Structures are given as structure tokens and as C-alpha cells.
């Protein structure tokens, strides 16, 4: 089989939930992935990962409990779903071994992406148990009188660079999320944070309120992973400037292809593995193959 290792050092991304490998890829599907209003803003993350040029793993909280070193081989950890569910962990965050392993992973230089209510569980004065690395918290009524001064948006961020008008469709989004001090808000709506970036020790956290699948959101997650992994410099490798077009490299087979995912003609600039580029016009649904 052809492996899609498109980089010399492909990034490893792990989805963290209560099932891990047991429900790999199926963790946000119900009954043949029928549309659910409560679910599509999370399922989009898994769908985007399925076609992304990363080595994707699914790990459980038990995996971390048995061997915290399981995190050593991972570049970016993703926790996605509603609070107090098996998706995000719920009561598992009361276990200091798991909590410290995940926070320590980020603090030492790892990346973390939280979608929805990551680590959502009311405990020790916090709701989002991943608030420290992600730099955001949910107002559940207990901290109404806390001063919340951080509301400035930074839409010129690396993560939003490919988005029309530097905006994002967050699907159902989330209400009542606010940013802690030192967090960079990328997008907030009516004083509710939808997208934020945060430096935590040597690592980075990205909060996203929801991410239904679309070609634009595909690119948002791709850039968020690169940013969280301190890998922005690698953006222009096997890359299409037009988010409707994708580049897939099969380095071991000496080939790469460029795919127009739409029913309309598209123009793009394609970057190859060494960072060199060329412009390309593509017909509707066209796939072009090239030799390396």
C-alpha cells in the first residue's frame, strides 16, 4: 500500500477521549454518521483529520494512566466534544496523574487543540480542566463578578490566513467562553470566544468552539495543528494556496497529485516538498499526477 508520508518528519496528532483506539474514527458518528445538530460541529474535526497529511492516532485516558510516556511520540493532542462526556473525559480530570500528564505535555513543548468544552467538568473552581494550557474558561455562573478584560481580536493570526474575511463558520459554536489573561483571541462574537491561541510554557494551545466540515475549516484545523506544533515554517511544503485544491504526496512511490475538490475550475499556486512553487489552472473535479 502507498503511504502518505508527505514530509520528512510528518507530525503525529492524537485524538484523546475515553475510548482511544476502540472507537478510532467513529468517535463522533452515530448511526452511520447521520447529521445531528449537537454533533456536526465536532464530527467535522474527525473528518478533516481523515484527509490531513498527519499521522493520526486515537488514545484513551487509560492509555495515559498506564504509561504517560505514550504522549512522548505525539506532537499535537486534540480533545473534542461536550463537557462531562466520554469524548472530553468528565470525571477523569479529577485524577492528578492524567491531568498533570496532559498539562505537562503541553508545558514541555507539545501542542493542544480543544474543541467545544475540552476537559469540561466542574472541579476545584474550574469548569474547563484544560483552561490553563488553552487560556480560556467557560462562565457557568460561579465567576460572574470576575473582571474579564481580554476581548481584543487578532484576526491577522497565522491560523486565519486562508479564511475569507478572516472569519470562520463555527457551526453551533459555544456560549459563555471567555479568555484568560495573556490569551490571544482570534475571534469572539458578542463577548463569547470562538477561537483563541495561547502560549503555555514551551507549548501552545488552541481553542475552537466548533468546526463543521468544509474546505475552509479543513484549512483552519490544518493551520491550527501546524501552529500548535511550532511548525509554521513547514506550511509551504506540499501545499495549495487555494483551499479548494489539495496536494497529496506519495514520496515512497515518487509521485504526487493535485486535486480540485469542487465542481468549478480553480486556480492555485502549488508548493512542492522543497518549497518551490508553480501556478496551476484546474478543471472541475480534475486530478493531476506528477512524478517527483
Model regions and ranges:
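Short beta-strand segments enriched in small/hydrophobic residues
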Residues: 11-27
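Short, small-residue-biased leader/transition segments that mark boundaries at the very start
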Residues: 1-6
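Redox-cofactor binding/interface segments in oxidoreductases and associated redox assembly factors
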Residues: 78-79, 114
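A short, well-structured beta->alpha microelement
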Residues: 49-68
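Short acidic/histidine-rich motifs immediately flanking catalytic phosphotransfer sites
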Residues: 70-77
Amino acid at each position: 500500500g502507498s503511504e502518505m508520508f508527505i514530509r520528512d518528519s510528518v507530525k503525529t496528532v492524537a485524538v484523546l477521549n475515553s475510548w482511544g483506539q476502540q472507537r478510532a474514527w467513529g468517535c463522533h458518528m452515530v448511526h452511520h454518521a447521520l447529521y445531528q445538530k449537537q454533533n456536526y460541529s465536532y464530527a467535522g474535526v474527525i473528518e478533516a483529520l481523515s484527509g490531513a497529511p498527519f499521522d493520526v492516532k486515537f488514545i484513551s485516558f487509560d492509555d495515559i494512566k498506564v504509561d504517560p510516556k505514550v504522549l512522548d511520540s505525539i506532537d499535537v493532542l486534540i480533545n473534542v466534544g461536550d463537557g462531562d462526556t466520554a469524548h472530553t473525559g468528565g470525571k477523569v480530570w479529577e485524577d492528578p496523574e492524567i491531568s498533570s500528564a496532559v498539562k505537562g505535555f503541553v508545558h514541555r513543548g507539545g501542542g493542544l487543540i480543544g474543541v467545544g468544552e475540552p476537559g469540561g467538568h466542574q472541579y476545584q473552581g474550574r469548569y474547563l480542566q484544560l483552561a490553563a494550557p488553552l487560556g480560556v474558561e467557560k462562565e457557568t455562573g460561579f465567576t460572574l463578578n470576575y473582571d474579564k478584560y481580554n476581548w481584543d481580536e487578532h484576526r491577522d493570526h497565522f491560523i486565519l490566513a486562508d479564511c475569507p474575511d478572516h472569519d470562520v463558520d463555527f457551526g453551533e459554536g459555544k456560549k459563555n467562553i471567555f479568555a484568560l489573561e495573556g490569551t490571544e483571541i482570534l475571534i469572539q462574537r458578542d463577548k463569547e470566544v470562538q477561537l483563541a491561541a495561547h502560549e503555555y510554557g514551551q507549548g501552545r494551545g488552541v481553542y475552537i468552539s466548533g468546526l463543521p466540515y468544509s474546505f475552509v475549516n479543513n484549512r483552519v484545523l490544518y493551520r491550527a495543528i501546524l501552529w500548535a506544533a511550532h511548525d509554521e515554517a513547514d506550511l509551504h511544503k506540499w501545499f495549495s494556496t487555494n483551499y479548494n485544491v489539495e496536494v497529496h504526496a506519495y514520496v515512497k512511490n515518487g509521485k504526487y497529485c493535485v486535486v480540485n475538490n469542487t465542481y468549478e475550475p480553480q486556480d492555485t499556486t502549488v508548493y512542492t516538498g522543497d518549497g518551490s512553487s508553480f501556478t496551476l489552472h484546474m478543471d472541475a473535479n480534475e486530478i493531476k499526477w506528477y512524478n517527483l
